[in-house]
């Protein structure tokens, strides 16, 4: 099942978090539709900006939108003109005050969405798909990824029958919930049709969840500090507590042996 399901949804609450953080009762469907429209507005026409993900957080009067991008200068524009235009369009769409935060992706070579977008751009430019896939794999492994898998599906190389091919390097444990796996998907538009690009990047074991950390700390507090007693040291000449106890034990053993012999001799004499 781990091979088929989306890695982000499969690990919600374990290593990943929701990209939309809000609660609504009667307006739930309206907010979902609005979130889809916001993400479409930000990604359409901004392919060169390298947008990795868009996080949305809502309050009663305000909507906060965090845009993670590899090229923040393109999103901000000259003197912030592009950012002001985007903010105005979002406020017109939501009818609320919008707080727009543009965040830079520190390491785009191991961001799955950006890697998939880069491979798709090369396919649109008529670069050989195997060459584009291998180049993305080499860049990710050099940047510190523990493993990567890149898959292309469609009319590869202009073939009449569509097929899927993938290349993998390192480990990509899709069934391990604790594994920190990033997933990205992008479509390349070519003259032969669309080619889907999927990327899985394994970044290592994720740290413990907040619930696990709190449980471990509570168990440690309940156990309390444990005092370790130093073992008794034997002094030279037989002195010390350990030597006296051993002598007393040997004396008691000798007395018990003599008593047993005396009882046995008495029984034989009778």
From Swiss-Prot:
A single BP term in Gene Ontology: translation
This protein's UniProt keywords: Ribonucleoprotein, Ribosomal protein, RNA-binding, rRNA-binding
Compositionally biased region (Low complexity): 216-225, 245-263
One annotated GO molecular function: rRNA binding
Residue ranges of the TM segments: none
Region (Disordered): 212-270
Domain of life: Bacteria
InterPro entries assigned to the protein according to its UniProt record, in alphabetical order: KH_dom, KH_dom-like_a/b, KH_dom_type_2, KH_sf_prok-type, Ribosomal_S3_C_sf, Ribosomal_uS3_bac-typ, Ribosomal_uS3_C, Ribosomal_uS3_CS
Pfam families: KH_2, Ribosomal_S3_C
Domain KH type-2: 38-106
Gene Ontology terms: cellular component: cytosolic small ribosomal subunit
Subunit structure: Part of the 30S ribosomal subunit. Forms a tight complex with proteins S10 and S14.
Protein's job: Binds the lower part of the 30S subunit head. Binds mRNA in the 70S ribosome, positioning it for translation.
Record-stated family: Belongs to the universal ribosomal protein uS3 family.
Official protein name in the record: Small ribosomal subunit protein uS3
Species, as recorded: Thermobifida fusca (strain YX)
Gene that encodes the chain: rpsC
